[in-house]
Each structure stands twice: as structure tokens, then as C-alpha cells.
A protein has these predicted regions:
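Repetitive helical segments and hydrophobic/amphipathic motifs
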Residues: 13-14
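Intrinsically disordered, low-complexity peptide-like regions
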Residues: 3, 28, 121-123, 191, ...
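Absolute protein N-terminus
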Residues: 1, 22, 245-246
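C-terminal motif of bacterial Sec signal peptides marking the signal peptidase cleavage site
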Residues: 17-21
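Ser/Thr/Gly/Pro-rich, low-complexity flexible regions
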Residues: 147-294
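Acidic/polar, low-complexity intrinsically disordered N-terminal segments immediately downstream
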Residues: 23-103, 107-162, 288-294
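Bacterial N-terminal signal peptides that target proteins for export
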Residues: 1-9
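Intrinsically disordered, low-complexity segments enriched in polar/charged small residues
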Residues: 9-10, 205
Length: 294
């Protein structure tokens, strides 16, 4: 299961159980009973048709009896379609006696969601008026995002790089390269001769967060200043690093990488920041490019 949300649980828990630093006895929350979603919004990374996601619902007090609550989908605020893009397991939920939480279960239908979609589901709790915490209300939003499993093989072979570096310094809008897995580093590929012959570059795919498929790159030498600029600067090494404040990411569904890089020469200065877009292509397309060019 994969879900991201901005949580209110910390606040609710703080209200439910209070402790004092100077006394041994435990002081418990004895205020009104409220029921609410644990967050205002949730982002679900839908990777198949089988995975169920839990949308937590929290009460501020436990009771000695089961509590039935309802959840409705607000069709006028939703663009996701029930039974086409998602399924709700049940709109009627129970907070068991003595408990504080329950969950609405939602299953995304990946086959009917495209990568470009941002499908929203607006939810509202059906509660008695005295159970509504007006400061937070009864509504929450769920966004369905299409994700794909990470297959490093999809990022090996021929790739086309469209690069502002090659446009400015190599008189080329794009460059054809080959990539392969790094046998010594997990989830890492090697881009052979990325800009200049003999200078390979390693890119690491971060796979822990399917909603944030990021790329990491350590500082690397990617060429000589003589080859890049026609003269020697500093120690003659052209270095490439990842600039702060930029997002470098990949798409497993679409087989591309977007990468920002900063070029510099040690003890001399920064050349600039540039963008690379890697698009993996078939062997047939690569052969056509080698024959005819871009």
C-alpha cells in the first residue's frame, strides 16, 4: 500500500492523551467527542488493480459501544468515476467499542487511469451534528495517480538526450547514448560517453517513494575543459553536480528522466546550470538515427 497525506493525527492524539511532567498520574482527554478524517488530503499511487488503500478516520474519544458512520462521495466535486477509476469497499464504517479509529478502504483501477490523469475523489463524513468538529469539518480529498513498477531494464539500451548543454557547447540539439546497469551499485545505471567520449556518468534511481521517483547523481568528471572550451582552465577537469533546489526525476511509465545539472571547474568557477531529458528508444529507432541523424 502506498499513500501520502498531510496528517492531523498528531493534533488529535495530543488532545486525546495528555501527560504532566511533575505528576505520575495520567490525565486523559475529557472534552467533546468529534469524528474526522485524519488528514485533509491524500495522494494515492495506483500501481495495479488489486491494492487497497486505507483512508483513516479518527475519533477524539472512545466509547463503550460500536459507532456507525457513513462516508459519501461528492460527485459534484469529483472527477474520478466510481467503478471505472476506483472502488470503495464500503460506505458504512464502524468504530469498534473502546477504539478511536477506523478506515475507509479504496482500490484504484490502474487499467483505467493514465499517467497524465489527476483524478480527484471528494469525500464527506455523514455524522450527527454534535460529532462534527467545525474547525476541521467533515470533508477530505483523495487524488489518484497512475504509477508503474520500477524496472531498471527499461532504462538500459539506447537513449536520446535532449540537452541545453549540447545545444550551447556541442552544436547539437540531441545526442544518442547507450546505458547499462551498474553491476556494483543497486538501482544505478551508467550512461556511456554522456557528453564526451571516455566519460561515463552514473545515475541512481530512488525507488522507496513511488509518488516521488527521484534521481540522484554524485559529483562526477564529465569531460575536459580543453574539449569543452578549447583551452585549459584550472586542473582541466569539467565537473558536473546536482544543483540545490531542482527536482530530478524519472517516469517508469513513460521511460524518461529529467535531470538538472550544474557544470563547474574547481577553483575557477561555475559554468552554468543545464537540463537533460533522457528518452529511451528502440534499437530500430537508434539505428535510424545513426543513419539519418536526429
Amino acid at each position: 500500500m502506498y499513500i501520502k497525506h498531510f496528517t492531523l493525527i498528531t493534533l488529535v492524539v495530543a488532545m486525546i492523551t495528555l501527560t504532566t511532567a511533575c505528576k505520575r498520574e495520567r490525565t486523559t482527554y475529557d472534552g467533546p467527542n468529534y469524528i474526522l478524517f485524519s488528514a485533509e488530503s491524500y495522494d494515492l499511487g495506483v500501481i495495479d488493480n488489486e491494492e487497497w488503500f486505507d483512508i483513516p478516520i479518527t475519533a477524539t474519544r472512545s466509547c463503550g459501544y460500536d459507532r456507525q458512520i457513513g462516508v459519501e462521495v461528492l460527485a459534484n466535486k469529483s472527477n474520478a468515476i466510481a467503478r471505472r477509476h476506483y472502488e470503495v469497499e464500503s460506505n458504512t464504517l464502524t468504530i469498534p467499542a473502546g477504539k478511536l479509529t477506523t478506515s475507509l478502504r479504496i482500490r484504484g483501477i490502474a487499467d483505467n487511469i493514465s499517467v497524465a490523469d489527476s483524478l480527484g475523489i471528494a469525500l464527506r463524513l455523514i455524522l450527527d451534528e454534535e460529532d462534527v468538529w467545525n474547525a476541521y469539518g467533515t470533508e477530505a480529498s483523495v487524488i489518484l495517480h497512475k504509477c508503474c513498477p520500477v524496472d531498471l531494464d527499461a532504462f538500459t539500451g539506447y537513449a536520446k538526450i535532449t540537452s541545453t548543454w549540447t545545444m550551447q557547447y556541442m552544436n547539437a540539439d540531441a545526442r544518442l547514448v547507450r546505458t547499462r546497469k551498474d553491476a556494483e551499485a543497486e538501482n544505478t545505471i551508467i550512461v556511456e560517453d554522456m557528453y564526451y567520449d571516455g566519460y561515463d556518468v552514473r545515475l541512481k534511481f530512488l525507488t522507496e517513494d513511488r509518488l516521488n521517483p527521484a534521481i540522484e547523481m554524485e559529483e562526477q568528471v564529465i569531460g575536459s575543459t580543453g574539449e569543452a572550451f578549447g583551452t585549459i582552465y584550472g586542473d582541466g577537469k569539467l565537473l558536473m553536480t546536482t544543483p540545490a533546489g531542482y527536482s530530478n526525476y524519472y517516469s517508469s511509465c513513460e521511460r524518461y528522466v529529467l535531470q538538472y545539472v550544474t557544470m563547474y571547474v574547481a577553483n575557477v568557477g561555475t559554468v552554468g546550470t543545464y537540463v537533460n531529458i533522457f528518452e529511451w528508444i528502440s534499437d530500430d529507432e537508434a539505428e535510424r538515427i545513426m543513419r539519418e541523424g536526429f
